[in-house]
Amino acid sequence: MRCQVWNVIELNLSSSCLHGLLNSKSNIFSLQNLRFLDLSNNHFSGQILSSLGNFSSLTTLDLSENHFSGQIPSSLGNLLHLTSLDLTDNNFVGDIPTSLGNLSHLTLLLLGANNLVGEIPFSLGNLSHLTDLTLCENDLAGEIPSSFENLSHLTNLDLSQNNLVGEIPSFFGSFNQLVSLAVEENEFTGNFLLILLNLTNLSDLSLSRNQFTGTLPPNMSSLSNLVLFYADANAFTGTIPSSLLNIPSLSCFDLSDNQLNGNIEFGNISSSLSDLLLGNNNFRGSIHKSISKLVNLYTLDLSHFNTQGSINFSIFSDLKLLVDLHLSHLNTTTTIDLNTFLSSFKSLDTLDLSGNHISAINKSSVSNPVTTARPGLGLTNPLLLSRFNLSGCGVTEFPEFLRTQQTMEILDISNNKINGQVPGWLWTLPTLDYVNLSNNTFTGFQRLMVPSSWQPSMNYFSGANNNFTGNLPAFICAFTLQALHLRKNHLSGVFPENISESLKSLDVGHNQLVGKLPRSLVRISSLEVLNVENNKINDTFPFWLSSLEELQVLVLRSNAFHGPMQQTRFPNLRIIDVSHNHFNGTLPSDFFVNWTVMFLLGENEDQFNGEYMGTSYYSDSIVVMNKGLEMEMVRILKIFTSVDFSRNKFEGEIPKSIGLLKELHVLNLSSNTFTGHIPSSMGKLRELESLDVAQNKLSGDIPQDLGDLSYLAYMNFSHNQLVGPLPGGTQFLTQNCSSFEENAGHFGPSLEKVCDIHGKTMQESEMPGSEEDEEEVISWIAATIGFIPGIAFGLMMGYILVCYKPEWFMNVFGKNKSRSTSSTTR
């Protein structure tokens, strides 16, 4: 606190653990002569009162790092003496007030990390004295205002992580005092702006994750003070200008995830470089041994570098300071002694060798531990990795060096040819958090080599697609896991009762489990996904799971579940599949009334659009019957919804409450014995894409409102007792005639257009032998036409899954981690 003539003019309460609301009764509002007010890094909440705009003498106002919410009051535009305004890292919403353009003395305006929307006000261009403008991490849209041309004194401009569009304005080239420019994670387009080369004071330039195209200019060396250059995840083409890599001050360089090509002469790169990320481009040729000159590298990413031959991994042995090394998918076949290779490094934390054809020399790490020299002491310490990815390398043995890796957190050796038993010592690694052993040929688990009371801190384990036999491993089920995936094995017996109560995802589908679902599942309050498909479970419908408020996916298909299904409450259920069981009885008319997320999801569509279920570590996957085909969704969009009750023994009418599920995408009720009319309420399913009610005993008309469902691309009404004209909507006219066959009472112009029968009825299907043979040939041709694109699609999806890193790996192993150390320099 600072006073002048009995008046408090300066009040600094930053980092004082204060909380609560700032209301009109707060003593602060009696200090009308304040010039400096800093309440940053506290726990204040609620809205800012407009009366704060009455502090007419304020020159500095800092409310950053609190929990303030609501809109930024326009009255702040009355603080005409203000030179610094910092509202960073709060929960402010709404538009940026145009009145802030009145603050003509402002030099710092920091509004980042809020929830602000709308366009950037044109009036901010009036702030001609601004040196620092930060609007990052909001939801701002539109183009950069032309009025920004007046902000010629800017030294720092951060517009990153918004939804801004258009090209970078040419007047940016006149910001000759600019030191840092960040526009990453927007939707900017166009070529690299040549006029940016005039910014000779520029130290940090981040263009990442936009839609920039074209080539990089050859004379990048004019940015002679450049330290950080991030332009990853764009569509830049051509070669990397050698002048850019030669800038002496350059420390961090990221051009990964573009379409660059050509060769790279590593010997000409600035020796001060600490981070070099070039992965996921179109580079071809050998990795030259001159890379060994980059002795100051901490991070190196050359993933998807098409070497077209073997690699001598010893060329990396001089890079002793490396912390993160990414060498995945190099299109190489080589032999590597992991012990010898790893002993070259002092501080290696992350190693990614996935997607290569590696023959690993697998020495025992107990008798030959991986060690690294400690200069000046003549001693050696074991090298301890935290993250190791050997996925898809064709290795046949479990890597023995892992036995001594006491700091290992993330381990992925999936998609290999490793057989035998999972070693018991694996579970003794104290920091192990993520283990992926899927897609190998493991047969079992060695005896746990720890006391029964010992609990690892593991969050994720996948042993899917192996040859595990016997019971579900009780000791793994008891781990404090968030995700346990053991699908597609040969596991048998009953569920253990001691399943982790921290689970979010449990997938044991495609095994031979018997008995009933354990009632202990009801204690897993965080469970989001339960998949037990294709087992031999014999039980009634688990109504008791309705107490799990977070349950979003329930897959019981292809078991021996039986009995009726009564009205129950599943408020967050998005996907349910109970097909291929023995459920029977009628479904009450109000059966779906408490499945609220399927008729409220659209209200939060912007929140979930593009998001997938799972976490940064893993993605949930399921098989759904969609549009007449079984499709494997390797990642589940949060906005996807599906109800599949097919191939059971349900009877009676289809519940009218089905019409409440306005956000439903897939509905399959086929192969039951439903009777009565198709509910007209189905016409309210505005998001429906696939509808299958075939092979029931439905009667009456097809509701005409179904013709108005614009997303309905697939439908099957065949093998019922339906009558009357087909709806006239465009979607109906594009269906195959087989979608309506075996319904004797259909007629009308829509049916004639669909089936092109011109007067024939659906019963007149018999034809002479030659015509029948001809139709059979045509059917085979049609099947082949459908089959070939299916193969192409499958190969394409396989390529994508094999060649691109899973989301969890990019989040945990990827460049974001390495960037965090340098971003503080901005």
UniProtKB/Swiss-Prot annotation:
Q: What span is annotated as the signal peptide, if there is one?
A: none
Chief localization class?
Answer: membrane
Could you tell me which Pfam families the record lists for this protein? Answer: LRR_1, LRR_14, LRR_8
Instruction: Could you list this entry's UniProt keywords, alphabetically sorted.
Output: Cell membrane, Glycoprotein, Leucine-rich repeat, Membrane, Plant defense, Repeat, Transmembrane, Transmembrane helix
- Secreted keyword on record: no
Q: Which GO terms describe its cellular component?
A: plasma membrane
Q: Where in the cell is it found?
A: Cell membrane
Q: Which domain of life is it from?
A: Eukaryota
- Its source organism is Arabidopsis thaliana (Mouse-ear cress)
Q: What is this protein called?
A: Receptor-like protein 18
Q: What happens when the gene is disrupted?
A: Enhanced susceptibility to pathogen Pseudomonas syringae pv. phaseolicola.
